[in-house]
Each structure stands twice: as C-alpha cells, then as structure tokens.
Amino acid sequence: MLRAWAAILVVASVLLGCGSDDPESRPADAAQLKGAPPPIAALHRQGNELLDGGPEAFEQRLRELKGYPVVVNKWASWCPPCRAEFPYFQNQAAKRAKKVAFIGVDSNDNDDDAREFLAEYPVPYPSYKDPSLEVAAVFKGQLAFPTTAFYDSKGELAYVKQGGYRDEADLVADIERYAR
C-alpha cells in the first residue's frame, strides 16, 4: 500500500510540474509582463493561444504594433530545430516584454499537437495558425522551419532568418541588430 501512495505522489508531482526550479523552464511571470505598452500588453493577454484569422489578422496585428519592434517566430510542433530554439524565444520574450513584441506562427501543424507543444513550452504571446503557409508568406518565411522575421519599429520587415538558432546569444544579437 505504501508503494502505491509513493507512486501516486511521484505521478502527481510530475503532472503538477513540481521539482523544477530551472528559471529557463518557467513561463514569464506577471511581474515581467506588467507595465508593457497597450499594443504589447494585448499580446500578453493572448499569451500561449492559437489564433485564427489568416494573413489578414496577422497583418492587422502588425499594423497595431507599429511603433514597436516585432519578432515573429514560425514554428511547428513536429520540427526538431523549432523545439530546440523555442526556450530562447520564451526567455527573450519575457526579458523584453515591455519593449519588443513577439508573435508566433504555427505552420503546417494540427491544433492538438500545437496546443500540446505550447503546454510544454508556454510563451507570453499568441501564435497564429498557418496550416497552408499563407501567414508565413507575409514575411517571406514559407521555405524553412523554423523561420524568424524581424520588423523594425516603423513596421518594415528588416530581416528574415531561415533555419533555427543554435544558441540564445545568436537570437539576442539579431534582436538587438534588427528589432529596433
């Protein structure tokens, strides 16, 4: 009987996420997000959600964010390089929550797998559903997984990186270079 209770406690701890004190594995907390300007705060309110609307809704969101730099990350739950770099985006979105807008684009994926992925890697910004790469075409990101696009504060597409980031320092360098 004691073994059964021990097994139940272990399973409960895993399901509740207990035991991980690694700050890199935790989503942004409210204190990090508090004080963001209204257009970026609107993204935070939709954090970790999958949004419909296609390229029209995505382009409207970009227009709403004019005046702020924007980082767009195209990903898919089945993409190993996307999984490898996603913690970098989690971390940078939290660190830059008041100055840089982040948006995800979930391409060529199904909703259940995407939601499972976001449950594993929660982010303080939404992702637009893009089953046919129409949203990715807005930022010329149809070819590679992952792809990251950088918009400057004027709303101009400044740079598109095809392929994944090997380390967070490279992402930081691109954010500082292009998302201004």
PLM region spans:
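N-terminal targeting signals for export/organelle localization
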Residues: M1-D52, A173, R180
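A short beta-strand-turn-helix
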Residues: Q46-V70
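Sec-exported extracytoplasmic/periplasmic mature domains
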Residues: R63-G67, A84, N91-K98, A119-P126, ...
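Short pre-active-site segment immediately N-terminal to redox-active cysteine/selenocysteine motifs
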Residues: Y68-V70, W75-W78
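Hydrophobic beta-strand anchors of alpha/beta hydrolase catalytic cores
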Residues: V71-V72, F102, T148
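C-type cytochrome heme c attachment motif
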Residues: S77-A84, P146-T147
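Structural microenvironment flanking redox-active thiols in thiol-disulfide oxidoreductases
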Residues: R83-Y121, P131-V138
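Thiol/disulfide oxidoreductase modules built on the thioredoxin-like
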Residues: F117-P124, P131-A179
